[in-house]
């Protein structure tokens, strides 16, 4: 039996008091004693050194689908990805099996590899989404019996996780398992094998395959159903030995922002497991809110769904509050907005930029928050040994002094570092 820990909380009231009010972002910072040296190895004693955070450890993310057409130099998408990179350090790339391998044996590995490497070249971390899902599944799987379908699913995971190892090391291994065996919108191969095996058995099979292909990968389970059913599923998976690295939480809020109380309740309930939490797919609108009677978001079909000035101000405020709540929680390691540009899914005004590429207020607000408020930039003075103590947000830092420069890291479990300035 797994020994779970209620993280920082004995009850909801205590949880909220601790996580939201006490040292709000102190858990995002660390102190490191850095020795600065020149290229010859001589300590830079009694020297002013300017240090600046250049890359957050925290994963500030967004859907990165635009990187695929950007690899061909398409102007609109190159412009979008440049704006994307000015804001984010983490992005989700599409590995939907039905798109990735429309014809059996012909995966789009080369295109996805180009996109992932393009992100890496600009300092962004790519995530693959998803390895197993009943929606967007490969139609050709339907020709096979369940045993063969499972075998091909595991082969697919082994192939793709192995091929992308070192480039993509974070994966949504399986998506939306709560609904998977009862999904009845259309017949598909993955729902078939989930019915046959059961949820926990299928989750264990696909996670074990991903872990075997890349033992160091971050492996997520991911779902939009945040009811007790998801908690029960996670509990069953962990007790079955499924190597879940982090819990994925989806919040597509097309029907209105859920607000602080509901967000804190989600954090409270999923902190129970003591695992890192990734908010993997998050949507906030800058236009008309979807009617509440819509059950499946995909059923809401409109000819156009414009962004409005009032909606853009609302979206800006909602994104800021949501980010502040999530960044304040010690177990949250990543937040990913789903659409970078309006009109990407359901034609919704859900992006941080408009369809014409102009920046919305929410883009400016998040850039201010991430790169101006949650940053560290200071000048330190070294001692006789060239050492200086630095306290700042964890991540990658640049250092400069005496017309030379270098870099170092501030990490949670790293008390000392050496920075060579050249």
Regions found by a protein language model. Give the residues of each.
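Beta-strand-rich domain onsets/edges
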Residues: 1-45, 50-67, 90, 102-103, ...
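Aromatic- and acid-rich polysaccharide-binding/catalytic face
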Residues: 85-99, 103, 157, 164-169, ...
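Substrate-binding cleft and catalytic face of glycoside hydrolase catalytic domains
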Residues: 86, 90-103, 112-218
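Short Pro-Gly-centered beta-turn/loop motif in secreted/extracellular proteins
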Residues: 72-86, 388-396
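Alpha-helical scaffolding within the catalytic cores
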Residues: 71-82, 110-115, 155-160, 200-207, ...
């Amino acid at each position: 039996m797994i020994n779970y820990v209620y993280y920082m909380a004995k009850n909801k009231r205590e949880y909220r008091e601790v996580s939201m009010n006490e040292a709000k972002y102190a858990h995002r910072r660390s102190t490191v004693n850095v020795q600065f040296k020149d290229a010859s190895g001589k300590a830079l004693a009694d020297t002013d050194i300017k240090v600046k955070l250049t890359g957050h450890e925290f994963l500030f993310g967004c859907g990165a689908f635009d990187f695929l057409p950007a690899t061909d130099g398409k102007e609109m998408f190159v412009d979008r990805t440049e704006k994307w990179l000015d804001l984010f350090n983490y992005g989700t790339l599409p590995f939907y099996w039905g798109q990735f391998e429309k014809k059996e044996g012909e995966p789009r590995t080369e295109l996805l590899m180009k996109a992932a490497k393009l992100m890496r070249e600009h300092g962004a971390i790519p995530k693959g989404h998803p390895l197993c899902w009943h929606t967007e599944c490969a139609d050709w799987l339907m020709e096979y019996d369940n045993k063969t379908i499972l075998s091909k699913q595991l082969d697919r995971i082994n192939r793709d996780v192995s091929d992308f190892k070192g480039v993509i090391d974070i994966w949504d291994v399986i998506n939306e398992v709560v609904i998977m065996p009862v999904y009845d919108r259309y017949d598909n191969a993955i729902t078939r094998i989930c019915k046959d095996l059961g949820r926990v058995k299928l989750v264990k099979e696909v996670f074990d395959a991903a872990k075997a292909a890349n033992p160091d990968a971050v492996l997520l389970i991911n779902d939009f159903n945040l009811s007790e059913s998801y908690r029960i599923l996670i509990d069953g998976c962990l007790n079955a030995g499924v190597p879940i690295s982090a819990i994925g939480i989806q919040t597509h809020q097309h029907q209105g922002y859920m607000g602080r109380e509901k967000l804190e309740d989600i954090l409270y309930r999923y902190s129970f497991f003591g695992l890192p939490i990734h908010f993997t797919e998050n949507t906030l609108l800058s236009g008309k809110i979807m009617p509440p009677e819509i059950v499946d978001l995909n059923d809401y079909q409109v000819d156009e769904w414009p962004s409005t000035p009032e909606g853009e101000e609302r979206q800006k405020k909602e994104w800021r509050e949501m980010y502040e709540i999530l960044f304040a929680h010690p177990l949250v390691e990543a937040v990913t907005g789903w659409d970078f540009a309006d009109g990407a899914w359901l034609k919704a005004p859900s992006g941080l930029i408009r369809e014409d590429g102009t920046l919305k207020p929410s883009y400016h607000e998040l850039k201010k928050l991430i790169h101006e408020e949650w940053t560290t930039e200071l000048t330190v003075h070294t001692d006789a040994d060239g050492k200086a103590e630095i306290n700042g947000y964890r991540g990658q830092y640049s250092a400069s002094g005496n017309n030379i420069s270098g870099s170092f890291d501030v990490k949670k479990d790293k008390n000392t570092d050496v920075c060579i300035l050249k």
